[in-house]
Amino acid sequence: MTQLRNVGGSPFWSWYGFGSRCCFLLSRSGVLAYTGLKVETNTEYTPQGLEMILGRYAFQCRIDEKAFVHGRGHRKTREQRYYEKLKEYTEKLKEYVKKIWICGPERNSYSKTDHDATFMRMKKDYMGNDQLLPAYNIQIGAADEYIAVIDVKQYRSDMDCFVPLMEKFRELYGFYPKYPVADAGYGSYNNYIYCQEHGMEKYMKFPMYKKETKEKEYHENPFRAVNFKPGPDGTLICPWGKKFRFAYRKAVKGNRYGRQEEYYTCEDCGGCPYKEQCKKPDKNRMVCVNRELSCMYQEVVENLESIHGALLRMNRSIQAEGTFGIIKYDRWYKRVVRRKLKRVSLEIYLVSIGHNLYKFRNKRKRAAIAA
């Protein structure tokens, strides 16, 4: 597999997987030995390193590109073949370095017509055909029918947009919101810990919130690891009475707070009468447990299912969803006309200002009529 990575934070990039092909070219018996050129083969290469090898090879073999032959009836020399192949690898690596630099460390795609845009799945793809289009992730925070804070991000996931939006809110108003209510796209371990650290209550749904609260069969399913009974010795007891013993602990990739998940393996699934309902593979079942995250989920459910939480959820649906509804369907603004992140941000800010002025005028008009 071919991958690129940054070497020690420097402007040099190495190419994994590329080394297998380049090593084959450079270390073949007799390929460069007859020239007297000694080249150290590696599993990783940089464009600068390949250019140096290419230059040394051209100097050693006295290569003149003007004398190269092409087309039918012409037989390339061994030096020309190896030189062109090495040059092809060098140019390809430069191309990949440029593309990965444009992408940056926080995304894995970009549009050729707008390098700041990221390919995302659109809501209008009703049939789920995996239609990916270049887009930006627009985030708003609504209060009293006004757009209080707005942010434009390149992240595909809403979870990654929560912290920057809250920091922007604090930058504007000098404090964090007490009850940041959000839909299931924002509830994650990172965001819950962030709320704890900054004095915010956990009122963001998690991805399985609806299923957890509305489907009794799923919530009370005895074969879910969270419903296993804890044993006195730290094990988990399945419905058949078998013990799940601790196997290992694994860090979650990309988690900024050092979140870890524990894996437990059943001592013996042989002869289990619930095998078809409990597991699919033939080997003993292994489950993943994160007790801290499960406690957070329980706290979120208690918050949102309370009367106060129900009122906050209703208010969010009216204000946040209503704001997008007015902008997209009443004003027919469904697509940005500018490119580049700064220009798109400017356009969204102007639309938001227009929305707030519209709301302000309506409120004054209603107040005047009521008076």
Model segments located where?
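Anion-binding and metal-coordination hotspots
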Residues: M1, R5, L26-A371
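Cysteine-centered motifs
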Residues: C22-C23
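Tryptophan (W) side chains
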Residues: W13-W15
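Alpha/beta catalytic cores of group-transfer enzymes, especially the acyltransferase/condensing modules
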Residues: S10
